[in-house]
Swiss-Prot record:
It comes from Acanthamoeba polyphaga mimivirus (APMV). Residues 288-317 are annotated as: Disordered. Its main location: host cell. Pfam families: Pox_G9-A16. Residues 353-355 are intravirion. This is Uncharacterized protein L65. Residues 1-21 form the signal peptide. One of its GO terms (cellular component) is host cell membrane. Keywords: Glycoprotein, Host membrane, Membrane, Signal, Transmembrane, Transmembrane helix, Virion.
Length: 355
């Protein structure tokens, strides 16, 4: 959803669907009669000449946003004399006039072409025309020129009189371009300031933006502050392992566009682990792009005595491993041999006693 246009907003003025393509008002031309004239050409926000939307002298509106039928003035931002659009000298071209007081020729009525249902507000990117209050004149783009580009030749309902506003000032416009705001990219007023081109122009812009809004913008999944990735940072970068970034349409820095992810994703549930001869095997789990150093040495586990004797600890052989193994294999035969030996000795003793 695009933002509403408010009085006192700084904007870029565009003619998006002219016979010459998408046009942005970019400068002023100088004439012999002493009055400057707005000029426009195909270009980007970096070429744009920003304007401020103001309430005309003698008017007041309770609503802060510009609405269909409101009177506005377009005042050049980079003009110490507050030059504004003016229906002036009669030669048929839109002028810039300085320090204009109450004057109908400087006042323009907003005519939204397709207003939304039950909403008369003007939105950024929405198409509209302007009508001069003093005369029936629609500003109409005639062609790129160093002298004048915007004609006032009466009423005009062609594509050349269709206008559109983009959010300013320039830093705001760059951010909207980097966020791939469609009113900036269709048609293209952004050039290299596109978040999807990975040109590098948007790296700092998007990083600073995501540091401020964090997860309130779900498309910041690749560019969140480092504290949001502490659990996984030892395994790999977010563009390789974080589900807020991988396989999403999130904003990315140029270094994240074609990541080299050599990550082994290990997930072992010890409760479901079915092992045998655990005390005779060393298990080593390594997750990440490379082996990680062993953790700090902790206390050596010791056997605990259970009802059936000492409980072996995995990885540590029993203290008397050899004797335990010996008796577990030959204990029964040793006992039988001892019994037989006792019987034989007893029999021999009885024999000699009876003699």
């Amino acid at each position: 959803m695009q933002k509403k246009v408010l009085f006192n907003d700084i904007v870029f003025v565009c003619f998006p669907i002219t016979d010459n393509g998408s046009i942005i008002i970019s400068d002023i031309g100088y004439s012999d009669d002493g009055y400057n004239r707005p000029t426009g050409r195909q270009g980007t926000i970096e070429n744009g000449d920003p304007y401020r939307i103001t309430v005309p002298a003698g008017y007041s509106y309770t609503n802060k946003n510009v609405q269909n039928g409101n009177m506005i003035r377009l005042v050049r931002v980079n003009d110490s004399k507050n030059g504004c659009w003016y229906n002036g000298s009669g030669d048929g071209w839109l002028e810039i006039r300085d320090y204009v007081g109450p004057d109908w020729r400087a006042d323009w009525t907003v005519q939204i072409i397709n207003p939304a249902n039950n909403d008369n507000s003007l939105y950024y990117g929405q198409h509209f025309r302007l009508m001069n209050r003093a005369q029936v004149e629609n500003p109409t783009f005639q062609g790129p020129s160093d002298f004048a580009s915007i004609a006032l030749w009466g009423s005009n309902n062609t594509n050349n009189s269709v206008m559109m506003l983009l959010n300013g000032p320039l830093d705001t416009a760059k951010l909207e371009c980097c966020k791939d705001n469609p009113i900036f990219t269709q048609p293209d007023y952004c050039a290299n300031y596109r978040g999807t081109t990975c040109s590098g122009q948007c790296d700092d812009i998007l990083s600073n933006y995501c540091a401020q809004v964090t997860t309130t913008d779900p498309k910041c999944g690749c560019l969140l502050p480092a504290s949001f990735y502490t659990q996984n940072s030892a395994i790999g970068p977010p563009e390789c392992i974080d589900d807020r970034c991988v396989d999403t349409n999130s904003y990315r820095k140029s270094t994240q566009c074609h990541p080299n992810c050599q990550i082994v994703d290990c997930d072992i549930n010890i409760n479901d682990f079915n092992g045998t001869n655990i005390n005779k095997i060393v298990y080593e789990q390594e997750c990440g792009s490379k082996s990680t150093p062993n953790g700090p040495n902790g206390p050596t586990p010791t056997p605990s005595n259970g009802p059936n004797g000492p409980t072996p600890v995995p990885g540590i052989p029993p203290a008397n491993g050899s004797s335990t193994s010996f008796f577990s294999r030959y204990g029964l035969w040793i006992i039988i041999a001892i019994i037989l030996l006792i019987v034989i000795i007893s029999a021999v003793g009885i024999y000699f006693y009876l003699r």
